A protein has these predicted regions:
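Cofactor-/ligand-binding subdomain signature composed of acidic, glycine-rich
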Residues: 1-14, 184
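Flexible loop/turn segments at secondary-structure boundaries
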Residues: 54-57, 128-130, 155-159, 166, ...
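Glycine- and acidic
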Residues: 12-20, 85-91, 189-192
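Cofactor-binding active-site loop characterized by glycine-rich and histidine/acidic residues
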Residues: 4, 21-143
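Short beta-strand segments
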Residues: 49, 122-123, 148-152, 215
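Residue-level detector of conserved catalytic or cofactor/ligand-binding positions
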Residues: 212-220
Length: 220
């Protein structure tokens, strides 16, 4: 909790000084702390969608000084960038929806090379309506190369979300993830619902449970 508080203070100071996406980065602090606590990056691969929500990821991967030292604020990019951190930033991701397809590609390559590591795609609800996101979910659900998709369903996007997908996300929220109508299960995924994504303990417990799920060889 102290780390999350310090990170939020740094994000507010950073964005109030030079601008940037303050909301997404304040909202995913505990989620990304949990990801880096449970998974062993850079051995495990973390793909952040859009990546303007990646400040916490960068702070936890050796770049905190760029958010703490005002003289270095302009030396850090806003998006994940392999030129900036080839170990931790696998892809340059500056637009919406590709994370699931990219993670699926990593999973397929891992299988072909017979390697052993975890893969996590972190995507917001607003990005799920993108065609590339559906393509990734659809193909991965069928081909059984296990990886983890974290959906940050904060009901926030650059524009209001519309469509049947968001009706189902709302139904899942209203039923604490128990609705018999489940978009993700219909595509072949095991599903874990976390009611409070800013509760670090809940996030960590869900991520640890996800590792048990993906140990089953035929489930994404």
């Amino acid at each position: 909790k102290d780390l999350a508080k310090q990170m939020r203070a740094a994000i507010i100071n950073y964005t109030s000084t030079i601008g940037g996406h303050v909301g997404p980065n304040l909202g995913d602090v505990e989620a990304l702390i949990g990801v880096h606590y449970v998974f062993d990056a850079p051995k495990d691969k973390i793909v952040i969608d859009v990546s303007h929500q990646d400040f916490v990821h960068k702070m936890l991967t050796g770049r905190a000084q760029y958010y703490l030292d005002k003289s270095k604020f302009t030396e850090i990019g806003e998006f994940t960038d392999p030129n900036e951190s080839p170990e931790y930033d696998i892809f340059y991701a500056g637009h919406t929806s590709p994370s699931i397809s990219l993670a699926f590609g990593l999973a397929k390559a891992r299988s072909l090379k017979k390697e052993d590591f975890n893969i996590v795609a972190f995507i917001g609800d607003g990005s799920l309506s993108g065609g590339v996101a559906f393509e990734g979910l659809n193909n991965a659900g069928k081909l059984n190369d296990n990886f983890i998709v974290i959906v940050n369903d904060n009901q926030m996007a650059i524009a209001e979300n519309h469509g049947s997908l968001y009706d189902n996300l709302r139904e899942l929220r209203e039923t604490n993830g128990q609705s018999e109508h489940n978009y993700f299960k219909s595509l072949g995924y095991d599903y874990i619902y976390v009611a409070e994504g800013n509760d670090l303990e809940s996030v960590i417990n869900a991520l640890k449970l996800s590792l048990i799920h993906i140990s089953e060889p035929t489930r994404p």
